[in-house]
Structure formats: structure tokens, C-alpha cells
């Protein structure tokens, strides 16, 4: 019995990351999603993957057909109600590091360390007591509750030409960890049966 408990305990310790898996948020970017809405033919999509265990947040954006040239892009948080309204900028200002500026179409892919002050708008950190951990928790809560949106600003629409509220598309699957857990449980059951027999 002791071997069974140890085997299951060991397997659970190896799959701890599966219990705190990265979470993926996605959105469709459009002028109709702005507040107030605009008639821009611009369109795009964004994926934000946040890993609470490593404090890393990957931002992937693709956009095209903007009327104006890009001037900035960032994540705003947290609106009063999910999926509606406006909020201040949560991530770094004036724009994401390396975001393509002065263009009407492009792609972007960057990973931020959310345990660093440089990943945030200082006003967002100040609003959360000056604490990085509280700021990270607030942004994570805003993402999970649908109260955060990614905005692409342009010369024609300084308040934002296209945006979209980020919605949870579920944790990133970690099949290796789950397979290991299944294997350990199978081994534990086999040991238990042999011992009982």
C-alpha cells in the first residue's frame, strides 16, 4: 500500500504544471468592436497566452486593411462589465515592444515577463497599490473575466482603430503530463492488485 501511495504522489508531483497550465485568450479585432464603434475596414486577430507559473505572457497579433498607420497597441484592463466599455492601458506604453508602427497591416509576436515593471503601464501598477504581484493578478483576473481588450491604435483613429475583448479559450493541453499521470495510476493499481492477490 505504501508503494501505491508513493507512486501516485510521485506522479502527481510531476504533473503539477498541468494543474497550473498556461491559459489562452483569443479575439477578433474590428472597428465595430471599438467604443464608440467605427466603420474601419480594418480587421485582425489576437492570441494572448498567459502562464501563471512562469509569469510569461505571449502576445500574437495579425492585422490588415487599416485606414490609418499604426501608432500603438496594448492591452487595456479592466472594464466595468465583461465585453463592453473602455479601460486604461494595463500593458507597457506607449506601445508593445517591437510592435510594427507606421503600417496598415502586419503581424506581431512577443513574450513578456509579467513579473517585471517594464511589462506594465505605470498607472496600472499604481492603481493596484504599486505591487507587481497585485498588478499581475488584476490583469490575469481581467483576462479571465472578459474585461480586457487588445487595441490597435492608428493615425486615423487615435483612440483605437480595431480592438477585441480577449476571451478564454481554455488551458493549453499538456498531454505528456496527463499520460504520465495515467501511467503512474495504472502502475499503482497493478501493484495494489498484485499485493491483494
Give short role names for the model-derived ranges.
Residues 194-197:
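Short, charged juxtamembrane terminal tails flanking transmembrane helices
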Residues 173-191:
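A short, hydrophobic C-terminal helix/tail in secreted or cell-surface proteins
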Residues 12, 29, 178-181:
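Generic leucine side-chain signal with a strong bias for well-ordered alpha-helical environments
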Residues 7-15:
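Bacterial N-terminal signal peptides
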Residues 17-19:
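Bacterial Sec-dependent signal peptides at the C-terminal "C-region" and cleavage site
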Residues 1-6, 192:
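Bacterial N-terminal signal peptides that target proteins for export
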Residues 21-73, 77-171:
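Metal-centered catalytic cores of metalloenzymes
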Amino acid at each position: 500500500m505504501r508503494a501505491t501511495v508513493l507512486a501516485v504522489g510521485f506522479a502527481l508531483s510531476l504533473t503539477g504544471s498541468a494543474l497550473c497550465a498556461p491559459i489562452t485568450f483569443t479575439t477578433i479585432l474590428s472597428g465595430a468592436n471599438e467604443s464608440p464603434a467605427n466603420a474601419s475596414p480594418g480587421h485582425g486577430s489576437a492570441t494572448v497566452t498567459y502562464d501563471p507559473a512562469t509569469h510569461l505572457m505571449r502576445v500574437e497579433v495579425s492585422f490588415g486593411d487599416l485606414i490609418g498607420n499604426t501608432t500603438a497597441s496594448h492591452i487595456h484592463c479592466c472594464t466595468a462589465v465583461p465585453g463592453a466599455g473602455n479601460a486604461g492601458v494595463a500593458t507597457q506604453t506607449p506601445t508593445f515592444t517591437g510592435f510594427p508602427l507606421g503600417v496598415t497591416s502586419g503581424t506581431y509576436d512577443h513574450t513578456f515577463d509579467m513579473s517585471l515593471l517594464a511589462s506594465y503601464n505605470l498607472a496600472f501598477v499604481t492603481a493596484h497599490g504599486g505591487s507587481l504581484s497585485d498588478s499581475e493578478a488584476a490583469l490575469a483576473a481581467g483576462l479571465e473575466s472578459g474585461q480586457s481588450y487588445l487595441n490597435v491604435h492608428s493615425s486615423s483613429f487615435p483612440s483605437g482603430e480595431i480592438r477585441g475583448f480577449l476571451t478564454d479559450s481554455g488551458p493549453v493541453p499538456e498531454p505528456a503530463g496527463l499520460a504520465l499521470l495515467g501511467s503512474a495510476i495504472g502502475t499503482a493499481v497493478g501493484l495494489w492488485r498484485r499485493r491483494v492477490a
